[in-house]
Design a protein with these regions (language model features):
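Conserved Nudix-box catalytic region and its N-terminal flanking loop in Nudix hydrolases
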Residues: 17-56
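HhH-family (HhH-GPD) DNA N-glycosylase catalytic core used in base-excision repair
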Residues: 55, 61, 129-131
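Active-site-adjacent beta-strand/loop module that shapes the phosphate/pyrophosphate-binding cleft
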Residues: 61-63, 70-94, 103, 107, ...
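C-terminal structural segments of small proteins and small subunits
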Residues: 107-121
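Charged phosphate-binding loop/patch that engages nucleotide di/tri-phosphates or the phosphate backbone
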Residues: 118-136
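Short, charged, solvent-exposed linker or helix-capping segments at domain edges/interfaces
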Residues: 94-99, 113-116
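Conserved N-terminal beta-strand and adjoining loop/helix that marks the start
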Residues: 1-19, 39, 70
Length: 136
């Protein structure tokens, strides 16, 4: 039976730009760019897991604002259910505690990065919601 993981990802937005993080060399899909986040642990809600992961990976205290979209993909023999959430408010300065580097860019610029495949549909959903004028 294939292992299934629930994973959360943050589309962190500030001043019209979103934060991308480059995966470290020791991780799956090394060097690809992604939205920061991680696995949902037993007993956690998705927003709780995201707050914890952003504290661990970036050193920020985030306020999870709104659900964006989900995507399912097989990665390294595991079925990943990836759920994106919008984060527009946080305290602290994001730092690359886990990732190689961080980069702020517009959502359109993000499409030019070598993104982790599972994150592309989430970015497209975010861009579509912005184009539809959904509230910020």
């Amino acid at each position: 039976m294939q292992k299934t993981l629930d994973v959360v990802a943050a589309i962190i937005e500030q001043d019209g730009k979103i934060l991308l993080a480059q995966r470290p060399s020791h991780a799956d899909q090394p060097g690809l760019w992604e939205f920061a986040g991680g696995k949902v642990e037993a007993g956690e809600s998705q927003p709780q897991a995201l707050i914890r992961e952003l504290q661990e990976e970036l050193g920020i205290t985030a306020q999870v604002e709104r659900y964006i979209a989900s995507h399912q993909r097989e990665v390294s023999g595991r079925l990943i259910h990836l759920h994106a959430w919008w984060v527009a408010r946080f305290s602290g300065l994001p730092g690359a505690h886990y990732h190689r580097q961080l980069r702020w860019c517009t959502p359109q610029e993000a499409l030019t990065f070598d993104l982790a495949p599972a994150d592309i549909p989430l970015l497209n959903a975010f861009i579509a919601q912005r184009a539809a004028g959904l509230p910020r």
